[in-house]
Design a protein with these regions (language model features):
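ATP-binding/phosphotransfer module of carbohydrate and carboxylate kinases, centering on a glycine-rich
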Residues: 1-62, 82, 86, 105-116, ...
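Glycine- and other small-residue-rich loops at beta-strand/loop junctions that grip anionic moieties
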Residues: 68, 146, 254
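Solvent-exposed beta-strand sheet faces enriched in polar/charged residues
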Residues: 66, 95, 250-252
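Short, histidine-centered active-site or binding-site loop motifs used for metal coordination
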Residues: 31-32, 69, 138-141, 214
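Polybasic, low-complexity association/targeting segments
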Residues: 64-71
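Phosphate-binding/catalytic loop of phosphoryl-transfer enzymes
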Residues: 71-172
């Protein structure tokens, strides 16, 4: 059998083709396919182009596409129609990218427990797979969420620099401000037009500088980390109070590449935070394989 999985996040989209034993047959990475960022037409175009290239030797038996921002409603219907039209004889399913994470958990076959996934990349969201099905808590997008994403880290840092530039007594030579100005190549005020043009992905690209400054002992970077992990911990507490039988949270996203982020969040929750040692696209393939059973 030929099993295809797609993991479409806010920054990149991974495509994986494997057999029923998990043997990798083909893999490729393209850009963002989040329809809220690139538009649904560009999203569908990228997904169909990538899947066609991935499966150039023949149609897959099953496909699961987990798409950030495209898991529900009209967007999900458009994606399903496009993939089904491309491979009309294949079993096709699509949903939010969090499904990929959930299928990276060893507990996915334990029907007595629920599995939660926490995504902290460009954006952030919590998803839960339980006897009630799959549902989301938080993850309303950068206009309405208030912390815990790469966008939030970058925005918090840039907002602090903008504020400091307007205060004559501010020290602009701190590790965090120095790193931000170096990346911007100009003052934050002069960079405002380019920040708005770059939008959410560009602002999120400043998040790693917070951790770099943190390692240099910058107190503002420490407070940004603390604020954002406080918000995430409170969200996880609400989810646990609602669901009850969750003891493991599968985690993914660029922020988890920073050990300080995982350490800070872990210290604020009694849930076990599990960062899988496989790519989320592997979870997409596992979900696709289940469609054939």
């Amino acid at each position: 059998m030929r099993i295809a999985g797609i993991d479409a996040g806010g920054t990149k989209t991974d495509f994986l083709l494997c057999d029923e034993n998990g043997q990798r047959l083909s893999f490729l990475t393209l850009g963002s396919a989040n329809p809220n960022d690139v538009g649904i037409d560009a999203c569908v175009s990228l997904l169909t182009r990538g899947l066609s290239e991935l499966c150039s030797d023949g149609a897959p038996d099953a496909v699961f596409a987990g798409v950030s921002g495209g898991g529900y409603g009209e967007y999900a219907s458009r994606i399903k129609l496009a993939l089904s039209s491309l491979y009309p004889h294949s079993v096709i399913e699509n949903g939010p990218d969090a499904v990929n994470l959930i299928y990276c958990s060893s507990r996915i076959d334990d029907f007595e427990s629920s599995v939660a996934s926490l995504i902290c990349g460009t954006g952030t969201a919590v998803f839960i797979e339980s006897k009630r099905g799959l549902f989301r808590r938080f993850g309303w997008g950068h206009l309405f969420d208030n912390g815990g994403s790469g966008y939030d880290f970058g925005r918090d840092a840039l907002r602090a620099l903008l504020d400091a530039e307007e205060r004559p007594s501010s020290d602009l030579s701190t590790p965090l401000f120095s790193l931000l100005k170096e990346k911007l190549g100009m003052s934050a005020h002069d960079a405002i037009p380019s920040l708005y043009r770059g939008g959410k992905p560009y602002i999120a690209s400043f998040a790693p500088l917070v951790f770099e400054a943190l390692r240099q002992g910058d107190p503002l970077a420490c407070s940004i980390l603390d604020l954002n992990t406080d918000i995430l911990a409170s969200r996880l507490a609400l989810v646990k109070a609602e669901i009850g039988n969750i003891d493991e949270v599968v985690c993914a996203g660029g922020l988890f590449k920073a050990p300080e982020f995982l350490e800070s969040l872990s210290s604020k929750t009694d849930l076990r935070l599990f960062v899988p040692d496989v790519q989320p696209v592997v979870g997409a393939c596992r979900r696709a394989l289940r469609l054939l059973r």
